[in-house]
């Protein structure tokens, strides 16, 4: 049973028939993880000139200073090799982050926007938009709205994105962190398949990645974590009133998300909007109220 060989053929079959990556210089960082053989093989068989890194797993070095969680390593190689594009996968290869030819990063929001627009133009996008989480940038939502598409949001986690997609008939979804779910091909995030979609658009356009892949300007986003050790602070009246006041202050100019971490004893506060000074004030006010009650 040749699992690697079958996956290589599956991945290549998601790439447009008759198209190649001839002449494209691609850096791929496999994070010393699951895709360390298959990603480089697929890219080379499609014709790309491949500069590979993160392809020497030893059982302990997965994601160590490499891959999509530390994409700066990949960006550096893109610039040194004068590559056309860089791809960083995480250890289990379900996430992808892209770098343009200047070594500048493109997160999952940018990739989803690009894929959605292309699928929409070709009549392939189902559900009238895409599914993402509450962490996706408001700029993505505004960009989709300008195309007559909508963004449906779920709680954080690619499993919740997929559940919503199945329930409501979408075929594209994902997370800002680089999980991209293309339900016509897979039922979970597949970093290589998503990367191949982006590479096909690059090959088709014959333009630099910086022009093709940066489709909207993200709005400023401010994140703050507040540690706590007791009780459900977000249910306290003083904090709820502060959050409501902050949301009223932002109005339609921004968005505020306050939630408990699912993995740590922390409350995460995120605000975004066109006025960075305003959103910083909002985050500091909410964080201050939480810290006062937590103290």
PLM regions: where:
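Gly/Ser/Thr-enriched, mixed-charge loops and adjacent short helices
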Residues: 1-81
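Predominant activation on well-ordered alpha-helical scaffold segments within soluble catalytic domains
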Residues: 9-12, 37-44, 72-75, 79, ...
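Short hydrophobic/aromatic-enriched beta-strand-loop microsegments
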Residues: 47-54, 105-110, 148-156
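Short, charged, surface-exposed secondary-structure boundary motifs
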Residues: 60-65, 117, 161-165
């Amino acid at each position: 049973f040749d699992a690697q060989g079958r996956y290589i053929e599956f991945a290549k079959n998601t790439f447009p028939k008759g198209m190649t990556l001839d002449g494209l210089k691609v850096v791929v960082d496999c994070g010393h993880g699951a895709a360390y053989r298959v990603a480089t093989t697929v890219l080379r068989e499609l014709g790309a000139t491949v500069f590979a890194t993160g392809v020497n797993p030893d059982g302990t070095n997965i994601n160590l200073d490499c891959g999509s969680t530390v994409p700066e390593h990949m960006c550096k190689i893109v610039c040194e090799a004068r590559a056309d594009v860089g791809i960083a996968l995480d250890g289990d290869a379900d996430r992808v982050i892209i770098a343009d030819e200047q070594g500048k990063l493109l997160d999952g929001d940018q990739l989803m926007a690009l894929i959605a627009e292309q699928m929409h133009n070709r009549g392939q996008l189902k559900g009238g938009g895409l599914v993402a989480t509450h962490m996706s940038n408001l700029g993505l939502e505004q960009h989709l709205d300008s195309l007559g598409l909508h963004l449906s949001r779920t709680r954080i986690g690619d499993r919740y994105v997929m559940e919503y997609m199945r329930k409501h008939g979408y075929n594209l979804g994902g997370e800002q962190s680089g999980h991209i779910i293309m339900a016509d091909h897979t039922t979970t995030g597949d970093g290589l398949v998503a990367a191949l979609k982006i590479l096909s658009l690059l090959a088709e356009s014959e333009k630099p990645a910086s022009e093709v892949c940066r489709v909207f300007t993200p709005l400023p986003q401010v994140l703050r974590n507040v540690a706590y050790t007791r009780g459900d602070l977000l249910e306290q009246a003083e904090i709820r009133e502060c959050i409501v006041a902050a949301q009223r202050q932002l109005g339609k100019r921004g968005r505020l998300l306050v939630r408990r971490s699912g993995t740590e004893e922390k409350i995460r506060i995120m605000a975004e909007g066109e006025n960075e000074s305003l959103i910083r004030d909002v985050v500091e006010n909410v964080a201050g109220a939480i810290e006062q009650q937590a103290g």
